[in-house]
Amino acid sequence: MVAVLGMASCKSSSPSDTVTAYFKALQAGDYEKALSYTDISDQEEIQKQLEKFKTFDIKVVDFEILSEKISDDGKNAVVEVKSSQTSSFSSKPEENTKELKLVKVDGKWKIHD
């Protein structure tokens, strides 16, 4: 049984909320904020990821959460998301569906992919 929590009560209260916030930050071009929803803590790795976003000019056009599965112990989750994005390789949006793995870190869901 899954309990549904009000989204207004707590930021990133569910894995889907974290993924939604991540993609909204990407849509806004706020790559640093997007990376704050991941479990990357190494500053060098964060800088590498930021450069990748900027170099390839990755822009999320649209996204949709398709499903969410939380492990029995409540420490891991998988969120399936369909997104369309453009990059420096193509201005035509490319659609893809991906399963993002999440882990709970200090009570917050973080993308671990």
Per-range role (PLM):
Residues S12:
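Short, conserved catalytic or interaction motifs in soluble domains
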Residues D17, L26-V78:
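Short solvent-exposed beta->alpha transition segments
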Residues I70-D113:
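Exposed beta-sheet edge and beta->alpha loop/turn motif
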Residues G6-S9:
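C-terminal motif of bacterial Sec signal peptides marking the signal peptidase cleavage site
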